[in-house]
């Protein structure tokens, strides 16, 4: 049987290991780093986590993260309110914003359709998207979901759903590798994918 640390240190390692992208060894490294870090540094991390949990919420309009709703994008009158870019997660909004190529609005689904993980369309922020589309100002919806199986399934579902409207539905152009994530795409590739989007 593998040796485990006692009490608090093992609970801390386990907590870090539960985070996405952090395995057992990485979790152990972080835990021991914090154990040896100055108290101020550890307290700064604790305060940052507490502050995020207390202050950060989801925008009532688009579903992006914010401290006040509506979020800065939805509240900005200089943005193009006739275009909505649909993304999977808030981190995808930041990736697209870094391109400086897009000045429209966003809609965050909060995930993708994934029958293996029991995620159905009703579990996503789709009903609010349909409500937003009743606004006659919206002329185009860009489906900017990751080019993997789940993203493609969600794109297909939304395409069929939106085909019943007069709204132009487009998706990102090729350039993003199949199975890749928008989050990891460089700004140039993502900018070109936005500029070259095509009808669905």
Predicted region positions:
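Long C-terminal interaction/binding lobes of large macromolecular proteins
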Residues: 130-200
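Extended interfacial segments that mediate partner engagement and assembly in macromolecular machines
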Residues: 27, 76-142
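Catalytic cores of large soluble enzymes that bind and process phosphate-bearing ligands
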Residues: 4, 37, 41, 117-121, ...
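Cys/His-rich Zn2+-binding cysteine-cluster or related metal-binding knuckle/ribbon modules and their
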Residues: 2-9, 18, 31-93
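Flexible, active-site-adjacent loop/turn segments at secondary-structure boundaries
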Residues: 17, 72, 91-94, 104-107, ...
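Solvent-exposed alpha-helical segments within well-ordered globular domains of core cellular machineries
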Residues: 10-14, 28-32, 43, 47, ...
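Conserved, well-folded catalytic cores of nucleic-acid-processing
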Residues: 15, 19, 37, 52-55, ...
């Amino acid at each position: 049987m593998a040796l485990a640390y006692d009490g608090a240190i093992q609970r801390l390692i386990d907590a870090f290991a539960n985070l996405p992208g952090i395995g057992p060894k990485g979790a152990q490294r972080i835990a021991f780093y914090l154990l040896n870090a100055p108290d101020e540094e550890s307290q700064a991390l604790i305060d940052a986590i507490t502050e995020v949990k207390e202050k950060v919420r989801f925008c009532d309009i688009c579903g992006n993260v914010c401290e006040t709703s509506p979020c800065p994008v939805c509240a900005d009158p200089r943005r193009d309110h006739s275009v909505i870019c649909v993304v999977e997660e808030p981190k995808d909004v930041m990736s697209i914003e870094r391109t400086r190529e897009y000045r429209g609005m966003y809609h965050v689904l909060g995930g993708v359709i994934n029958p293996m993980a029991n995620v159905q369309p009703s579990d996503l922020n789709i009903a609010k998207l349909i409500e937003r589309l009743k606004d006659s100002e919206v002329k185009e919806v860009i489906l900017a979901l990751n080019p993997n199986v789940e993203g493609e399934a969600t794109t297909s579902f939304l395409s069929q759903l939106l085909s019943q409207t007069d709204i132009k539905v487009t998706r990102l152009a090729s350039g993003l590798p199949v199975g890749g994530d928008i989050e990891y795409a460089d700004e140039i590739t993502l900018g070109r994918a936005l500029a070259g989007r095509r009808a669905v």
